[in-house]
Amino acid sequence: MKLHLSALALGTTLLVGCASSGTDQQGRSDPLEGFNRTMYNFNFNVLDPYIVRPVAVAWRDYVPQPARNGLSNFTGNLEEPAVMVNYFLQGDPYQGMVHFTRFFLNTILGMGGFIDVAGMANPKLQRTEPHRFGSTLGHYGVGYGPYVQLPFYGSFTLRDDGGDMADGLYPVLSWLTWPMSVGKWTLEGIETRAQLLDSDGLLRQSSDPYIMVREAYFQRHDFIANGGELKPQENPNAQAIQDDLKDIDSE
């Protein structure tokens, strides 16, 4: 189960620092909010406390940290060729070559990617949030499409989650069988949940956890699509306010 809880860590910070201009921003929409809230309640109030969280606690407490790091490095290394292609598609050949170098060094010298040799050798080759095909679409202004909460999966939009399926067309991801892909997805989901166990209070303290999760999801993907930059939101009434101020000054 992939609940996209990693959005909370970055998204909560962004929500504090950025104003939001509504769910229609950058193609955001939530036409199925009633259904989504029902699925959210199932995912986060039934599935998470009784299945996902206990597994994540056991993973954190009993799996050695070096083993967790190695598995995370390995699954991340599988995505490096697709990330490289997406940077080229976004017109950023420098970052594309950075990820080519990461894949080459970590695969050859890092035991197939279990050791992040590249990141240890050069700070400029540190592992970063992967740019998937959904991020490329966002880079060119493609809207998210309807937001949906899926059972056992969590937050989903056609652009970022559906678009990411295109990454599976590139090696090494294209070489994975269906069971291998499920195993990768499961490992990533458990590791993400384990990393956020200490942040559970964020949701419990929120007046509307569903809105918090939804907006954190959008903020996180906006941040990635914008190349790690926070773009100020334009006030739709800014021009009218400026005109009023000019009228006052002219009097």
Annotate the PLM regions.
Residues 1-5:
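Positively charged n-region of N-terminal signal peptides that target proteins for export
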Residues 6-16:
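Bacterial N-terminal signal peptides
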Residues 14-35:
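Bacterial Sec signal peptide processing site at the extreme N-terminus
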Residues 31-65:
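Post-signal-peptide N-terminal segment of Sec-exported extracytoplasmic proteins
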Residues 71-74:
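Beta-rich strand-turn-strand
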Residues 77-158:
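Mid-length scaffold segments of soluble, non-membrane domains
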Residues 131, 135-251:
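A structured, mid-to-C-terminal "fold-capping" secondary-structure block
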